[in-house]
Amino acid sequence: MIRLRRGSLYRLLRDWIADGRGVAATEFAFIVPLMLVMFFGTVEFCSAIAVNRKVTLMARTLSDLTSQSPSVADADIATFFTVTNKIIWPYATGTLNPYFTSPSSGTISELYVDQTTKQARVIWSKGSAPRTADTYVTTVPSALLVPGTYLIFSEVSYQYVPTVGYVMAKAGVTLSDVSYTRPRQSSCVLYIAGTTTPSSPCPTT
């Protein structure tokens, strides 16, 4: 009797080990979560790359539109920001007031390269985080620091928040870029405050 039970138990164990039914379902259950993470991760990274490209286009557009004008007033700059803000669509656009903010932020500045020190100094600046006039921008590439010339300098950033927060941080990542252009219509782009036109053709101080 004991031998029979042992033999039956052995056969049951052997048959259980040899039984392949349900193996595929078990493997699939283990693989599905990994596949989902990879899928959503790919989608999020592709979206982030697309947004990053749009941020670059926003920075270039903002500086390019500004550099094509011989002079700008607050209304002109607000229009440039409005046009630039549409580039990020279909992703969330920034709130215009009059410069875009959250999730976008941007600043447009004119820089003057000092003839003596060859440093880029802020002449005027407008945007969601404008730079202080007469301060220096130290990140300008050396090839652009031509003494006595002007630069239109744009800065744009975007807070990209992923739809699924398993791959990227739920708070999102900040994507940013800058662009430099030369004034196209004149030596500099004059900023007109109110109705007063600056007396100096191109201010250096």
Predicted regions and their residues:
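Short, conserved structural patches
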Residues: 2-3, 60, 67-205
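Alpha-helical assembly-interface signal, strongest on the long, hydrophobic N-terminal helix that forms
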Residues: 1-90
